[in-house]
């Protein structure tokens, strides 16, 4: 590249200033003579430190160029492997991609839970503002608010048909809502403290709940009566989730354990105790993932010939653990989050795990290689909850920043 006469003159003066101000007197006088420079004080001021400034700005720009090049390469790779026009990925391998499709505002306090409806193109969010909101995830439209709780709504759960919605709250109640008429049809009292988790059992006849009163209770949907109480946790029970056939329930607690209970007998079948802090969340592995898990972990197929069941747990110790419930063994620990893990679940294709945490990220894990394969900076504040649609390519997240975000997978 050829410099113009003016640029050459400016460069020479900047070099002369650099030589003089750094004490290279001899080199300065030779250079000044050879470059035929007529130095005067006014001009000197203009070129003082100019060479160093140019040099540092070039380095800064080089760094920026390298960052942009790496982002461009990543985008190209994503476009060819996952973009709508590139080579088609198997839907089982679709993962959430930034940016979000929608960022939905409306809650006036942190969002505590987000879930998809099993049938319609809606999702539901619960919040510390004591409300439940319904949104259309395809259009991003707000549909309605369900009001009835008098304190933070902690968890929500649909039955398999999506006709009933259960919610639980720090107001110590569990409510059952008719999701067709959007009316509260039953309120259940019985816990002595904040009810932190609720789930409708797969058969739709019973609801299970967990509380800060250290108990897990089972309720009859038809009557609202409490029919069973499971005791054993020594601290606040954070979450409770039934397995696919409803014969087992898993729970996690501030006592740093995960427990698995036999519903019929109320017996604690397993106590899983390798976390080093409060266990915030749990999730059962779908049967579609059993073969991938067995392959990844080398776990034995039992006498029954069936592997599993398998369970995931996420903790304030910043780790995610995978457990073989039948043996009580921890099969793997995934490390990567920089803060409390608040939500964890299996990808519907069975090959990946998704998690969210107080480090404001949503992460996708390739558990076969025990590595985090994608990190999305999902929210401005802690990410409290996530859900993965069973059939449509969407993930939803909720946050302390009061927003709900919809992420498209491809």
Curated annotation (Swiss-Prot):
Name listed for the protein in its UniProt record: Platelet-activating factor acetylhydrolase IB subunit beta
Changing residue 162 to S does what? Abrogates interaction with PAFAH1B3 and RSN. Also impairs localization to centrosomes and microtubule plus ends. Reduces protein stability
Question: Coiled-coil intervals in this record?
Answer: 56-82
What InterPro entries does this protein map onto?
Answer: Dynein_regulator_LIS1, G-protein_beta_WD-40_rep, LIS1_N, LisH, PAC1-like_LisH-like_dom, WD40/YVTN_repeat-like_dom_sf, WD40_repeat_CS, WD40_repeat_dom_sf
Q: Where are residues bearing N6-acetyllysine located in the sequence?
A: 53
Spans of the WD repeats?
106-147, 148-187, 190-229, 232-271, 274-333, 336-377, 378-410
Consequence the record notes for mutating residue 238 to A: Abrogates interaction with PAFAH1B2
Sequence ranges assigned to domain LisH in this UniProt record: 7-39
Broad class of where this protein is predominantly found: cytoplasm
Tissue specificity: Highly expressed in brain, particularly the hippocampus and the olfactory bulb. Also highly expressed in testis, including all seminiferous tubule cell types, all types of spermatogenic and Sertoli cells, and meiotically dividing and elongating spermatids. Expressed at lower levels in heart, kidney, large intestine, liver, lung, ovary, small intestine and spleen.
> PROSITE patterns from the entry?
LISH, WD_REPEATS_1, WD_REPEATS_2, WD_REPEATS_REGION
MF annotations from Gene Ontology: dynein complex binding; dynein intermediate chain binding; identical protein binding; microtubule binding; phosphoprotein binding; protein heterodimerization activity
Gene name linked to the record: Pafah1b1
Membrane-spanning residues where?
none
